[in-house]
């Protein structure tokens, strides 16, 4: 869980606006979560479709990430979040803590997607270029996300009644943890779109 805590406290919510009062309505269906996971997957894949290796590897500056590095980072963070998710749902359910949750689903999504707050990725989330090809990196993301979507679709885990303490937001549930993952994907899809919009991006 140490990796997950570092991720949550450093990589995603630095600068997050203090949440408002808790929303009492609990969405037990999976519609929002599945929509977020599917849409952010599809948007990322659409943005990288048809790009050449030169385009995928282009950097706006030596210390900035390329498109393919954004993809690898998203995959690394998703795997860390899934490790934390599985650990969380294997613990005894604690529905009595639902009353302590302050952050709404919408606040989590908007807070992570906001790129006006620049943050440094944890070391385990920094791209390592461990793939034999750019196509393999994209395939790895696709397989990881499809596996996560399959889990959400088929699981009987009570995601809303497994609550963990977030170092910034306070208590959040296992459902919200996966919303965080989808929003993180969108955050870096925005980043790779900025790379593609750079005047020096290969044609």
What annotation goes with each model-predicted range?
Residues 1-4:
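Positively charged n-region of N-terminal signal peptides that target proteins for export
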Residues 6-11:
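Sec-dependent N-terminal signal peptides
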Residues 15-32, 83-139, 172, 199-203:
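Short, helix-capping/interhelical loops that line the mouth of catalytic, cofactor-
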Residues 23-64:
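Start-of-domain marker
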Residues 29, 33, 40, 44, ...:
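Stable alpha-helical elements in mature extracytoplasmic
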Residues 58-107, 154, 158-203:
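Short, contiguous alpha-helical
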Residues 115-181:
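A charged, solvent-exposed segment within the mature domains of Sec-exported extracytoplasmic proteins
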């Amino acid at each position: 869980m140490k990796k997950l805590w570092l991720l949550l406290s450093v990589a995603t919510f630095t600068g997050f606006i203090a949440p408002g009062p808790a929303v009492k309505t609990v969405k037990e269906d999976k519609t929002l979560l599945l929509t977020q996971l599917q849409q952010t997957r599809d948007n990322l894949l659409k943005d990288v479709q048809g790009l050449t290796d030169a385009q995928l590897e282009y950097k706006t500056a030596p210390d900035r990430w390329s498109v393919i590095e954004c993809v690898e980072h998203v995959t690394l963070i998703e795997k860390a979040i899934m490790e934390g998710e599985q650990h969380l749902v294997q613990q005894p359910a604690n529905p009595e803590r639902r009353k302590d949750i302050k952050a709404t689903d919408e606040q989590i999504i908007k807070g992570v997607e906001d790129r006006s707050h620049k943050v440094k990725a944890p070391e385990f989330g920094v791209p390592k270029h461990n793939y034999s090809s750019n196509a393999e990196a994209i395939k790895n993301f696709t397989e990881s996300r499809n596996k996560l979507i399959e889990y959400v679709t088929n699981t009987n885990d009570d995601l809303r009644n497994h609550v963990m303490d977030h170092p910034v937001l306070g208590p959040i549930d296992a459902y919200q943890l996966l919303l965080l993952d989808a929003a993180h994907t969108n955050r870096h899809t925005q980043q790779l779109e900025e790379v593609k919009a750079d005047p020096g991006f290969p044609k």
